[in-house]
Amino acid sequence: MKALDKIREIVNKFSFNIREAQEIICHVLKIDKIQLYTENPEITSEQAHTIKSLIERRLKKEPLQYIIGECYFYNIKIKVGRGVLIPRPETEILVEQVLERQKLISNTGNRILDLCTGSGCIALAIGKNAPEFQIFGIDKSEKAVKYATENKALNNIKNVIFLVGDMFNPFKEKIFACITANPPYVKTDEISKLQPEIKNYEPLEALNGGEDGLNFYRKIIENAEKYLLNSGLIFLEIGQGQAKAVQNIALMSGFNVIEVVKDIAGIDRVMILQKSKSL
């Protein structure tokens, strides 16, 4: 059977998403979408068996990114699998905001700390686009740091170092010009309401932000001033409806709220804080 015929069969038989069917076929055949449509290769019986297995996994709601083993984030390839959070397009907004303030950050210093680094996507995207920075990505999950380290090698990015650790523990005080984080921010009692792809497959420790979803914001903001240089910045991804609560934590800790940036859906998504010179 030809590849395009196989895609039509999958879509019709399982009411399958056509884009996902294309990605699975391309993954198994080791071709891109242009080759898929220009060459329309024949599928061998062995490839058909592999495709069937991957389709069955997706029908069980396993995320496509885990099935294929990779995704793209800010134009870099990121390897992912069970035990590491899948990068979201919304998180690219945080990277954009850091890069827009590249000169401002450089005026303070050249070290950036990426907390809860996971796959390393934020640290690597910044590192690739701003080679003058030295970036440290930290996560308490050894599996996540293993993926992050592999992604560093995959993309040949030299100015990023990944470490296993709990928040700020490995670092000396007052050395960072900027802190970035996409921390766990889902309320504990809301995890059961998430899509099955998320709650049944992605690591809960990368999602669970505690009873009110704010545990990690408190840990980050309340400790950040000890590690930031004067006028240093914090870039935080936040969940829907959390802006006011996170802003209050920031103000109580002596940080100025510089901006809250919305995502494409109009939801507050990234909060930018600055360390007061008086801290």
Swiss-Prot record:
Catalyzed reactions: L-glutaminyl-[peptide chain release factor] + S-adenosyl-L-methionine = N(5)-methyl-L-glutaminyl-[peptide chain release factor] + S-adenosyl-L-homocysteine + H(+)
Classification via Gene3D superfamilies: DNA helicase RuvA subunit, C-terminal domain (1.10.8.10), Vaccinia Virus protein VP39 (3.40.50.150)
CDD domains according to UniProt: AdoMet_MTases (cd02440)
Organism (species): Thermodesulfovibrio yellowstonii (strain ATCC 51303 / DSM 11347 / YP87)
Protein name as it appears in the record: Release factor glutamine methyltransferase
InterPro entries: HemK-like, N5-glutamine_MTase, PrmC_N, RF_methyltr_PrmC, SAM-dependent_MTases_sf, Small_mtfrase_dom
Stretches that traverse the bilayer: none
GO biological process terms held by the UniProt record: methylation; translational termination
Disulphides: none
Encoding gene (name): prmC
Residues annotated for S-adenosyl-L-methionine binding in this entry: D139, N182
Pfam families attached to this UniProt entry: MTS, PrmC_N
